[in-house]
Amino acid sequence: MQALNERDVSIDYAFMVTVEKFMRHGCKNVPDYMLSGSRGDFTGVGDIHFFYSADEVLYGALPDFEEACKRANVPYTVSARPKMVHCYCMLPIFKEAKEDFAKIVDILKK
């Protein structure tokens, strides 16, 4: 994650370092799966489709999500576009976002 910090215009790596503290809210017994989706048990989940900017800090979490999918034997696909911002495909106002938003719509229609 930290390696992507200089390329990410929307999420700073420093936030990722401190977010767990906020999520715990002073509690030491918060289950791991509540702190990060990649720490959860994906057993029984259908196909998962990850859409990332290849230049966002959170793209660095992809190996953790891939490992979680493999542990649960869950099929997954990954789409990663360079030079996009976090959640770009949810803002279908430019070409790349429109293309990937259309892919998401097609997936949801199935």
PLM regions and their residue ranges:
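Alpha/beta-hydrolase superfamily serine-hydrolase fold, recognizing
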Residues: M1-K110
